[in-house]
From Swiss-Prot:
The active site is at residue 68. InterPro entries: dITP/XTP_pyrophosphatase, ITPase-like_fam, RdgB/HAM1. GO terms for biological process: nucleotide metabolic process; purine nucleoside triphosphate catabolic process. This is dITP/XTP pyrophosphatase. One of its GO terms (cellular component) is cytosol. The keyword Nucleotide-binding applies. It catalyses: XTP + H2O = XMP + diphosphate + H(+); dITP + H2O = dIMP + diphosphate + H(+); ITP + H2O = IMP + diphosphate + H(+). The lineage of its organism: Bacteria, Pseudomonadati, Bacteroidota, Flavobacteriia, Flavobacteriales. Binds 1 Mg(2+) ion per subunit. Belongs to the HAM1 NTPase family. Homodimer. Substrate binds at residues 7-12, 69, 148-151, 171, 176-177. Mg(2+) binds at residue 68.
Amino acid sequence: MKLVFASNNKNKIAEIQSMLPESITILSLEDINCFEDIPETADTIEGNAILKADYVTQKYGYDCFADDTGLEVDAINGEPGVYSARYAGEQKNADDNMNKLLKALENNKNRSAQFKTVITLNLEGKQYIFTGIAKGEITETKTGTNGFGYDPIFKPENFDKTFAELPLEIKNTIGHRGKAVQQLIDLLTATK
């Protein structure tokens, strides 16, 4: 089965493809000649995932799935949330985003946070929504070189390492995206 993933983020595509059974092949937006930026104008993570999946299905006619992820930090009222990718500005720079977040939490003892991924799947005229959450805390410094985004400053519950220090296989099992993707896989393998 071939399925379009409404993303050109090569890190995300590789991470998700590594979790899928060999029978499911991901096509990127580039693979279907979609080079425009898909609007992410919703004010929720769920809303953005739906917007992206619907855009590809309606404009290009493909069954597809899309995701949106946000980091929600308790001490700053759930920020950066839906604005996680552009928290420090439209340039979407991960280091700038992490630095801004670390500055916002400076001298704050409450560092509780959660990553939330929502995947919307448009398949054969039906829409499915899957949510994965990984609870943890924001560290005081960046540690590790694996992963991307906020991974160097997010330490998942019951671990003494950040996502950026953990092997991809472990992150995929305990992480927000991995949990949502597993729900996607369960549905796709059940409907074959």
